[in-house]
Amino acid sequence: MAAPQRSRTTGAPSSGGPSENERGRGGDRRGGDRRGGDRRGGDDRNQFVERVVTINRVAKVVKGGRRFSFTALVVVGDGDGTVGVGYGKAKEVPTAIAKGVEEAKKNFFRVPRIQGTIPHSVRGEAAAGVVFLRPASPGTGVIAGGPVRAVLDCAGIHDVLSKSLGSSNAINIVHATVAALQGLEEPAAVAARRGLPLEDVVPGPILRAQARGRADAAAKASTGVA
């Protein structure tokens, strides 16, 4: 009686490497992942900080049923004083986010900063949402909720106090934060308009921290020259 044949799936692997088909499929798959990673990690994406604040699903009722689409509220900034907000809508979530990123880049604006914080207190409004921002001394951190924090992080503000009132809708809060940041003025311009010295406009702890930063930079420069 002949011995039963061993199944292909349960037989012991051969001593050689993987078959040509397996090597081809694995090679294509690994190569595709590497190429995809290079595209996602391009220079254009690395220079910006992106934060997806909220994603909503929208349903449209038509004769044949309901058609679903997605909206994405995205904040984009360089982490160094430039920030923008975009709103994208598409049938797929990644496409909606990509559209929001592109719109946010079109809405970039500069934010005045002093030693990682804002130069003065400010209030912003959008619809029923109200956001208050106040300067904070170095080391305080960003005291803010999710939507406000997303905008401040992308703008490169590291020390600030915030309070949001009224509407809790993320879209209103984000636009109120943007309105507050757009209402900021450079300390030198405020001092010149009021006829006051700069020390009377900027809080003392921030000025002292700024002076220490300049002294440290000068010390490092002198050490490097020597």
Swiss-Prot record:
GO terms for molecular function: rRNA binding; structural constituent of ribosome. Residues 20-45 have a biased composition (Basic and acidic residues). Coiled coil: none annotated. One of its GO terms (cellular component) is small ribosomal subunit. Residues 1-18 have a biased composition (Polar residues). InterPro entries: Ribosomal_Su5_D2-typ_SF, Ribosomal_uS5, Ribosomal_uS5_bac-type, Ribosomal_uS5_C, Ribosomal_uS5_N, Ribosomal_uS5_N_CS, Ribsml_uS5_D2-typ_fold_subgr. Keywords: Ribonucleoprotein, Ribosomal protein, RNA-binding, rRNA-binding. Residues 1-45 are annotated as: Disordered. One of its GO terms (biological process) is translation. It comes from the Bacteria. Residues 48-111 form the S5 DRBM domain. PANTHER family: MITOCHONDRIAL RIBOSOMAL PROTEIN S5. Part of the 30S ribosomal subunit. Contacts proteins S4 and S8. The N-terminal domain interacts with the head of the 30S subunit; the C-terminal domain interacts with the body and contacts protein S4. The interaction surface between S4 and S5 is involved in control of translational fidelity. NCBIfam families: rpsE_bact (TIGR01021). Belongs to the universal ribosomal protein uS5 family. With S4 and S12 plays an important role in translational accuracy. HAMAP family: Ribosomal_uS5_B. This is Small ribosomal subunit protein uS5. It comes from Beutenbergia cavernae (strain ATCC BAA-8 / DSM 12333 / CCUG 43141 / JCM 11478 / NBRC 16432 / NCIMB 13614 / HKI 0122).
